Amino acid sequence: MELNAFSSQYFPPIRFFADFLSQENPCIDVYENYQKQTYRNRCHILSPNGLQKLVVPIAHTGKRAMKDLQISYAQDWQKEHLRSFEAAYRRSPYFEYYEDDLMPIFEKKHKFLLDLNLEILEQLLSLLQVENKFSLSESYIESPAEDFRQAYDAKNPVEDLPEYTQVFSEKIQFIPDLSVVDLLFNEGPQSIVYLKNLKQQ
């Protein structure tokens, strides 16, 4: 079976989900080496002051496979991320609809980044009402049918996405390709329609 390779990501961006849902056999490559300053351990949300970058700290340096990467709890980053999500989305139309499914994630202390990211991915797929059909690699994927592992650049997010109403749209110009939670909290059940339309572009 030919696999389509994706990286494990922390509250992945919208474009990731559009691509992920368009593939027959999406596979998370858990053996790829961790790469700094990527969505593997960070996400972008829209705060009252504009784009906000949230980063999960890593416990060690040097090359490691994603499956072996441990999270650092030297600082209470979970409280910071939880407060940031609440400040950003408490006023959004669907925050109360989804908060009981997403906010408890910040109360768990996963040892490995991969486990945290996989729980987030599974929960987001459930909220999008999409069948959980992805697999995990058994080794590094050398020759995937399609390779999406480098497709999403946290430094240069995708800019040509259709606009939807964001929480602070009255004072902040639309920011595309934030974490898919931005779409969920603002569009709710219609989020899947937006993603399917992106798949066709």
Task: Describe the role of every protein-language-model region.
Residues 1-201:
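Residues lining hydrophobic/aromatic ligand-binding pockets adjacent to catalytic sites
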